[in-house]
Amino acid sequence: WYSLKNKSNLGIKKIYLTASGGPLNRLSKKKFKNVKISQALKHPNWKMGKKISIDSATLMNKVFEVVEAKNIFNLDINNLDILIHPKSYVHAIICYKNGMIELIAHETNMKIPIFNTLYENGDKQIKCKNLDISKLNNLSLEKVNKKKFPLVNILNHIPKNNTLFETLI
């Protein structure tokens, strides 16, 4: 939202939304069937409610975000993807057709994206901890293991045109 709000999407080649992978990211798929709800609720980076914690642990929250981005910015679903970034500092990566790449990064505090949505012109200063730039050293960005997180495969069935399919998700 922050990077695209006043821009045309014509120059966009690809947008990656990042997910931490939640508390189950480093767990083997074999151990998934024995996961307890209490484990899935213990997000390593964010303090969240129960539903969003479970959605994060399964990557369903990212499925919702991809669908939202597609509709809000009128993007082709094929130009959107999800990457795993366990530290949760980078929230989106926008790749442009001209070769430039823009990263949206901030501290793991939901006040920041909410604040910037409410005060979208950027003239107000938020009172919270800023991201220490050195935390961006050695960024870890990985493709989603779709066998481990099969819910992301729903995105393969999203029609190019707006339909009620997305509402049913």
Question: Would you name each region that the model predicts?
Answer:
Residues W1-I169:
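Catalytic, metal-anchored helix/loop core of enzyme active sites in primary metabolism
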